[in-house]
Structures are given as structure tokens and as C-alpha cells.
Amino acid sequence: MDIDILIEDDRWAAMDLDVLVRDVLRAISDTLTLDLAAAEVSYLACDDARIALLNADFREKATATNVLSWPAADLAPVVAGAVPTTPTVDVTGALTLGDVAIAYETCEREAADLGKPLAEHVTHLIVHGTLHLLGYDHIRDSDAALMQGVEAKILGKMGFDDPYMV
């Protein structure tokens, strides 16, 4: 796996994002039976100000959010609730997935609101953002149900509770 992690906000340094991201990718690979050995993916660990700029530029929403994803390929299913298309390697043998950005303050605030450790919430959001790279989405209800179920399975493999069970 070729994983690039850019830490723009020093508060992320306290969390071993390299290990966390590798653990997430392994759990996704195991759960979805995907071979991600050739995967290329980038993560930006930033602050709310940076993610608000990205959100404004790419989604025309000038507010901070927890996580943003930019898939390298459109793997989303045409039929609502269907499993996304399996990603394939390119002519160079690389499996380019895309990019994910995650904002510290929003993650910290949400974790506190949920009464969860920051690392647990960040793990969920890294899973969530990475699943977007793999064609999962939550715009349509049936797609959201599928994505949330997959997230719960992946997080369960990692020893975490289902984040959608309140």
C-alpha cells in the first residue's frame, strides 16, 4: 500500500495516523474481500479552517465538516442500495483510490458530544471517508443503510461498537 499522510495541524501528531490508517485499510480489505495491496491513497489531517476552504471550493459549502473525500474513480452503483463497482488497478499496476481530508476541531467536538474517545471517532471517520473512495455514499436512504452497515462491520472487526446504534 502506498499511503501518503500529510499532517497540517500539529494536534494530529499525538495520534498515530499511520498505524490507524493502515489498520482501517486492512479491516476494509478483510471485510469487503478487496485486495488493497496496490492501493494508493492520501490523507490530509488538517484543521477546521482548512477543511472549510476545501468544502467551499469543492462542495460550495463554506463551513467546516468532519471529513471530505475525493474518489479517483466513480465506483458508485447506478441502482440505489447496490454494492459499488470493485476498483481495478491501472496499467501501471496501481490501485489509485483518491484523497481524504479530516478536520481536528470538528472531530474533537463530535467525539466529546458523543462521549467517545477521539481516536475511536477518528477511526470511524477514516473508515467513512475511505468508503466514499470505494463508491459508497449516503445520499439515498438505501445507499446510506448499506454504507452504515458496512461501516459497522469494519469497525466491529476493529473492536469498536456500531456508531449508528445509540
Swiss-Prot record:
MF-aspect GO terms: metalloendopeptidase activity; RNA endonuclease activity; zinc ion binding
Keyword Nucleotide-binding: no
Subcellular location: Cytoplasm
This protein's name: Endoribonuclease YbeY
Cofactor binding mode and count: Binds 1 zinc ion.
SUPFAM superfamilies noted in UniProt: Metalloproteases ('zincins'), catalytic domain (SSF55486)
Function: Single strand-specific metallo-endoribonuclease involved in late-stage 70S ribosome quality control and in maturation of the 3' terminus of the 16S rRNA.
Chain sites annotated for binding Zn(2+): H128, H132, H138
GO CC term, one of those recorded: cytoplasm
Gene that specifies this protein: ybeY
PANTHER family according to UniProt: ENDORIBONUCLEASE YBEY, CHLOROPLASTIC
Pfam families from the UniProt entry: YbeY
Family: Belongs to the endoribonuclease YbeY family.
Keyword S-adenosyl-L-methionine set for record: no
Cofactor: Zn(2+)
InterPro entries xrefs: MetalPrtase_cat_dom_sf_prd (IPR023091), YbeY (IPR002036), YbeY_CS (IPR020549)
EC nos: 3.1.-.-
